[in-house]
Amino acid sequence: NRPKILKVRDEQRAVIAATLATATGPLTVVTAHLSFVPGFNVRQLRHIKKWIDDLPRPLLFLGDFNLPSGVPARVTGLTPLLKEPTFPSYRPRVQFDHILADGLSPLQLEAARSSARVWSLPVSDHCAVSVDIPLP
């Protein structure tokens, strides 16, 4: 009963960041699609967290992290804005898609949490996520 080695082919993954110039200062938005391979996605998340530490705040970090609820916030130390299942899109049972924030004011944080939504769309096996951020 030797353990079997399972080689998994994964596709290239990316992270994109944009810092928007608003009337009240910068707003940074980061999105990523992490690996579905357990452990590797956590390593990717830790690497991204180090990279975004130097980006301007406030900051939103969202996307398909392929990690269950609670894990991304624990790994990054960022504040979760959404805690709802997003997968599979036809009957969501687990949260793999996340919206995290850092540097929001208490008023922005409250408004963002109340506006965070999950959308079931016929284009993916995951639900889409969205949030509105009020600018002071």
Region annotations inferred by a language model:
Residues 33, 64, 126:
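Histidine-centered divalent metal-coordination motifs
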Residues 1-26, 113, 117-120:
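Structured beta-strand-rich core segments of catalytic domains in phosphoester-bond hydrolases
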Residues 17-24, 102-103, 124, 130-136:
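Active-site beta-strand termini and strand-to-loop segments that position acidic
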Residues 82, 107-120, 128:
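Low-complexity, intrinsically disordered Gly/Pro/Thr-rich segments
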Residues 20, 27-31, 54, 60, ...:
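A shared catalytic/ligand-binding motif for oxyanion handling
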Residues 8-12, 37-41, 92, 121-123:
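Solvent-exposed loop/turn segments connecting transmembrane beta-strands
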Residues 2-8, 30-39:
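Surface-exposed cleft-lining segments at the edges of enzyme active sites
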